[in-house]
């Protein structure tokens, strides 16, 4: 169970497919989510709760002390199997540890639904589709999270 997420605090972001905007947010997070072959629903729930609870928005004193909910932000969640690219051998990444689409999509959807159940507005990309993700990093603040608690 090693779900991976790259969480980027943004002032705005959008994802397009074939020139059509399919997801768009103002201030909040872009979450790039990678699902491994070992992942399960518990991993998706854990990661969603961790993302929702992160305190990386400034309070009145300028300290990172507020969650996305307290800041009134939204999430743009994008599935990204390339987070499991392994380049330890050679120069071309191998994706053996990435979940197959039929396993990854339900866990990606579970992650999104859990964020929504926690009260967040969530926009998404399109699963297993070539997308263009545009974002404006705020800070920049970028956090790596995995369900195995490696970082």
Swiss-Prot record:
Q: Name one GO cellular component term.
A: cytoplasm
Task: Report the main location listed first in the record.
Answer: cytoplasm
Tell me the domain of life.
Bacteria
Keyword Hydrolase in the entry? The reply is yes
* Localization terms from the record: Cytoplasm
Q: Which UniProt keywords apply?
A: Cytoplasm, Hydrolase, RNA-binding, tRNA-binding
Instruction: Identify the enzyme class.
Output: hydrolase
EC number(s): the record gives: 3.1.1.96
Q: Which GO terms describe its molecular function?
A: D-tyrosyl-tRNA(Tyr) deacylase activity; Gly-tRNA(Ala) deacylase activity; Ser(Gly)-tRNA(Ala) hydrolase activity; tRNA binding
Write out the residue ranges of the motif Gly-cisPro motif, important for rejection of L-amino acids. Answer: 139-140
Q: Which InterPro entries match?
A: Daa-tRNA_deacyls_DTD (IPR003732), DTD-like_sf (IPR023509)
Instruction: Please state what the annotation says regarding this protein's domains.
Output: A Gly-cisPro motif from one monomer fits into the active site of the other monomer to allow specific chiral rejection of L-amino acids.
Q: Which family, according to the similarity comment?
A: Belongs to the DTD family.
Protein function: An aminoacyl-tRNA editing enzyme that deacylates mischarged D-aminoacyl-tRNAs. Also deacylates mischarged glycyl-tRNA(Ala), protecting cells against glycine mischarging by AlaRS. Acts via tRNA-based rather than protein-based catalysis; rejects L-amino acids rather than detecting D-amino acids in the active site. By recycling D-aminoacyl-tRNA to D-amino acids and free tRNA molecules, this enzyme counteracts the toxicity associated with the formation of D-aminoacyl-tRNA entities in vivo and helps enforce protein L-homochirality.
Protein name as annotated? D-aminoacyl-tRNA deacylase
Gene name of the encoded protein: dtd
């Amino acid at each position: 169970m090693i779900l991976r997420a790259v969480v980027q605090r943004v002032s705005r972001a959008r994802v397009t497919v074939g020139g059509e905007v399919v997801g768009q947010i103002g201030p909040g997070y872009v979450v790039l989510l990678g699902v491994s072959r070992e992942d399960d629903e518990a991993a998706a729930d854990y990661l969603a709760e961790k993302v929702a609870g992160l305190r990386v928005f400034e309070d009145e004193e300028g300290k990172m002390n507020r969650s996305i909910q307290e800041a009134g932000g939204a999430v743009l969640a994008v599935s990204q199997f390339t987070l499991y690219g392994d380049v330890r051998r050679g120069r071309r990444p191998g994706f053996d540890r990435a979940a197959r689409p039929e396993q990854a999509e339900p866990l990606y959807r579970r992650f999104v639904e859990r964020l929504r159940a926690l009260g967040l507005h969530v926009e998404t990309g399109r699963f297993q589709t070539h997308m263009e993700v545009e974002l404006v990093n705020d800070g920049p603040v970028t956090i790596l999270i995995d369900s195995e608690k490696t970082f």
